[in-house]
Structure formats: structure tokens, C-alpha cells
Amino acid sequence: MGPTALAFGVLALPGATGRDLGFVLAAQAVPFILLMPLGGVLADRRSRAAVIAVSDVILGALVVVQGLLLAEGTATVPVLAALNVAAGALNALWWPAFPGLVPAILDDRDLQSGNSLVAVVSNVAFIGGSAVAGVLVATVGAGQALMVDGASFLVAGALVYSMRGVTRPTPSGESMVRDLREGWSTFVSLRWLWVLVAVWSVINGVFRGVFEVGGPVLMRRSFDGPTSWAVLQTAMAVGFLVGAAVAARLRPERPLRFLTLASFGLPTAILTLVAPAPFVVLAVAFFVVGMQIEFWGVLWPTVLQTHVPRDRLSRATAFDAFGSGVLGPVGLALSGPVIAAFGLPTFFLAAAALCALALALPLLEREVREMARIDPEPNAER
């Protein structure tokens, strides 16, 4: 619910443009990226469930405050940006902890199916949230939609907190700085990992600019605003759901090669926004993108969980998320000015070309092309 409600809440402010939306989103993305390594260290030293739960509760309160400000008509771009700085910091604690939760409670042979189940359930909620957000924004306003979204974080935090004793790691006895350095050493020693992270840094910068700024602006100009955007978000979410279900059964011998090749539908989908294509074509394109993203959502954590030492998993995941997302704020911040200077069609064309070029590069790396799938034995050591 949050992305849709926040996007149209910002765009509904007096005189607000895509540039303002990009600024608010970048305010959240910058601390999220910069603090991610620290979040990884914390998740490898503390109960991952407790880290997730506390982050959820505080984040829920922040989202409710944003909703109240929008509902009362007192919200401004600087205030929303400031609140989103805090939200980004909390997300930086949450994100590295979550991938370590699944292998802490499942046998290794069940990791892929467990990752798939998490993705399916999350996407069912995302589908419902996207639909409800569109209806709430169109009928009662973005502020009310954000308040409902914030309440969902409070409930989630309470549920996850009940698992806090299951995921308590063994303390390393080292300082946080040393743990951070060890996580970095693990990350850079895995060539396939940092190559893909570098490539996806570019792709994520493009993706966030296109789908978080360019998309909502296009919907306001050429379609029915939040209602149309909610339909496309729901189509993508259905793609997430189908992709997660399909990915549970996929056993590619070369998972990284498969994932990279499967991602070429993304630049194709961006091209449908140029003209733009008929709305039904856009919906199909968003559905396909959702499927491809969720292939990564299921298979990529499985690769990390089976190829990275378990006691360093959250730190490696943190550097993965840090590197992959570091250009996200750049994409968000630049997309508004680029759209204003060159127009939406040129913006989407350039984004599609850059995305296609970036996807081709990792196929030149042998470790990406040739890495084999690992099938864990039952009751493998965690």
C-alpha cells in the first residue's frame, strides 16, 4: 500500500511534480543504502527476529504520522522527506536480517521452497495492498491509505517478535568494525557476487526511476492517475505471485545464467511505456516483469544461502543490498529533472537501452555463466 499512497500523496501536494516525488523517495533510499552494512553486522550479532520486529513497529509509527499529515493537509515535501530519512534507516536494519530468518528455521533442503512460500504469501498481501491502496487513494485519500499501511507494520512487528528466541546467533566476540571488515572480505572474495551486484546497481537505479517516478507521472498525464497505477501495480504483484510459485519448482543447472537471461523482459517492458502502449499491453508487461523479479526473489536468496557461509550471511546480504541499491537514490533524484528536460518518451527509451546493456555484461563473466546449483543434503549443518 505504501508506495502507491506515498507517490500520489506527494503528487497531490500543491505545485508538486515528479521532481518532488523523486526527492522524497531519494530521502528514504539514501540512508537505506548507506546504513545497510551496519544493519548486516547487527543482524549477525543479535536476534534477527527481534531486529525485524523493532524496526517494523517504529516504521509503522512513522508511516501513520505521514498519513496523518497528508490527511490533515499539513504535509510538505521537506517534512515528508525528513520522515522518510528515518524510515530508510529502519529499513536498513530490517532488510539484512530477513534473509537470515528462513535458514534459521528450515532445513537446508527446504530453503528454495521456503523462500518461495515467503514470496507467495508476501505477494498475496502485496496484491491486496495494491488494490486497496488504489481504492483508498481514489476515494478517501492517500493519508488514510498510509495510516492503514502503518497499522499493518505494527501487527507484523508483534508477530515476528514472538520468534525472537529462535534466531539468536552465537556472538563472534569481535568488535562491530572487525565484523564489518570480515563481511566485506567475504563479499569481495566471491567474484560472481560482486559482479552481479555492480550490474544490478545500474539496473535498480533505472528501475526505481522508471517505476517509482516515471510511471506515476505517466499515469497522471495519460491515464486515470492512481486508479490506473494501482491496476498496473496489481498486475505486477500477480506476476510476483505466479513467478514465486513457478520458481519453487525451477531447478536450473546454471541459476545465475538463467536469472540473467530471464531478466531481458525488463527493458522490453520499459519500451511499452514510450508511446505508451495500450493499457492492457502495459498490464501484461508489468505482469511479466513481476514474474522475472520474483525468479530473483526466490532463486537468488537460495544461491546466497547455499554459497555463502551462514555466520556471515546477513553481512554478505547487506553488502549485496548496499551495492545493488546504491544507485537507486540517483535514479530517483535524476528521473524528475530528466523527464522535465527531455520528456517521458526519451526518458523511457534511454532507460530501456541502459538496462539492456547492463544485463548483457554479466554474461561475459565465466563464474556467472557457469556457477552450478547446489542441492543441500537433508539436515545439513546450519
Where would I find each of the regions flagged by the language model?
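Alpha-helical transmembrane-bundle signature of multi-pass membrane transport and export proteins
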Residues: 1-382
